[in-house]
């Protein structure tokens, strides 16, 4: 990602129980982003939330753990790469039976640096 170009942030709102061919949808999205060369993706697990087709507001109580929680995947990259990735992602989302929301907005990237790869212990 070049910080001199216009950047965008894509947010994908799904549920932790959403699947694509028996795999968690959030994993599929992150692997697709990596495979397509996007700068990075982060998955956030929400504490509480609901969507347009929700019957309940999902939240854990003191004595239980709820399997179904809201998830947000954030991907930041150049505007052109984000738009191209949306076109790759859209067919996957049209196939699934569950709901989904995607937002996109301009992002001002203040700093972006790739980390150095760790040296293997045996290559010292």
Language model segments and positions:
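Positively charged, small/polar-rich N-terminal and surface patches that mediate targeting and assembly
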Residues: 1-124
């Amino acid at each position: 990602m070049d910080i001199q170009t216009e950047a965008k942030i894509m947010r994908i709102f799904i549920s932790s129980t959403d699947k694509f061919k028996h795999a968690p949808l959030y994993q599929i999205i992150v692997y697709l982003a990596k495979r397509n060369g996007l700068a990075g993706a982060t998955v956030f697990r929400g504490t509480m939330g609901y969507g347009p087709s929700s019957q309940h507001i999902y939240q854990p109580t003191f004595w239980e753990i709820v399997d179904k929680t809201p998830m947000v995947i954030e991907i930041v990259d150049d505007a052109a790469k984000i738009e191209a990735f949306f076109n790759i992602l859209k067919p996957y989302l049209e196939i699934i039976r569950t709901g989904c929301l995607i937002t996109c907005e301009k992002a001002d990237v203040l700093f972006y640096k790739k980390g150095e790869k760790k040296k293997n212990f045996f290559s010292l």
